[in-house]
């Protein structure tokens, strides 16, 4: 009798898991990180040309979904900074921590990271910290513009049945720790 109940429980749990795939599609942090690695080409010149300008290249972006703050994505990454000013040229590396709000565009089947902002930044060499503080508003504006225009993840109909279904039936997104869930029903 116990074996029967155990078998029945296995069948029911299998059905529930199978039905779950019919009601939602889940994108993991790892999938977002892979997409960011492929798509991130942030390279920007900011500042006042001729007086002080900086070329910034963002690399090694890694996401944490909904872990630090509900409904937000936290990104960490590196940035190379080449600074030219009236005082000469300098190079630096930065460690950045960014926060953004993931937003789903149903028409494009894409997740964008909007309201992007730098929440923490350290620079090496340390003597460049004051320069970084001066550039931060420009960097925030550039990052916000870049990520508002370029999706972090795009659903593809040719990738998998679940992803194709998500692109057709998506009703928005839900941010959960470690994943973004795309429900097919309200």
From Swiss-Prot:
Superkingdom of source: Bacteria
Lipid-modified sites (N-palmitoyl cysteine): 19
A Pfam family annotated for this UniProt entry: DUF1439
Keywords carried by this UniProt record: Cell membrane, Lipoprotein, Membrane, Palmitate, Signal
Lipoprotein among keywords: yes
Location(s) in or outside the cell: Cell membrane
Tagged with keyword Membrane: yes
InterPro entries noted in UniProt: DUF1439 (IPR010835)
Segment forming the signal sequence: 1-18
Gene3D superfamilies assigned: Uncharacterised protein PF07273, DUF1439
Protein name: Uncharacterized lipoprotein YceB
């Amino acid at each position: 009798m116990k074996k029967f109940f155990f078998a029945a429980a296995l069948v029911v749990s299998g059905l529930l898991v199978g039905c779950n795939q019919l009601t939602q599609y889940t994108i993991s942090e790892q999938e977002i990180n892979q997409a960011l690695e492929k798509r991130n080409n942030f390279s920007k010149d900011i500042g006042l040309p001729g007086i002080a300008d900086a070329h910034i290249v963002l690399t090694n972006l890694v996401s944490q979904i909904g872990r630090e703050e509900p409904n937000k994505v936290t990104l960490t990454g590196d940035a190379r900074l080449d600074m030219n000013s009236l005082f000469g040229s300098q190079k630096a590396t930065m460690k950045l921590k960014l926060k953004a709000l993931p937003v789903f565009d149903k028409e494009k089947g894409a997740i964008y990271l909007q309201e992007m902002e730098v929440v923490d930044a350290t620079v090496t060499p340390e003597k460049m910290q004051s320069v970084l503080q001066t550039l931060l508003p420009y960097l925030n504006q550039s990052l916000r513009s870049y990520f508002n225009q370029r999706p972090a993840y795009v659903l593809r109909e040719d990738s998998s049945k679940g992803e194709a279904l998500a692109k057709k039936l998506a009703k928005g997104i839900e941010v959960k720790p470690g994943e973004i869930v795309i429900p097919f029903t309200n």
